[in-house]
């Protein structure tokens, strides 16, 4: 947060001298924040998503309004399906960008041929950005599953390791699938 402020306006220094508040330990959820953007040296966001896909053992569900991954992520999704992981991609049937819709659909044939299930949500413009890995790890935030989010935009996401939270995300995903 402070870093983003200082990038936008280097004269803002009040955040640099303040310690963050102590984190509450209520609810029993373990969560980890990660940020990315063009000024960060490492592609941390990309690495986290790639690792999540490669670590999936049983089931992986991705929900994104904009789907335009690079070849590495496509290969990881197809490899996950090939090793028996149930991989589901939920995208909007109608997109607010025709170009993005065409681009997204260009990946579908290879993914479906490898065993990835693609569900087109028809209940409006789907804007959820999430991954649910083996019903036990959730990743959500501002990042779309596309090159703009992965390489150009400032994004923030949260990884949550909590069965209760993952169960709620699973119910939300099920509601999307019912409308697909």
Please describe what each predicted stretch is:
Residues 1-180:
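Charged, low-complexity intrinsically disordered terminal segments
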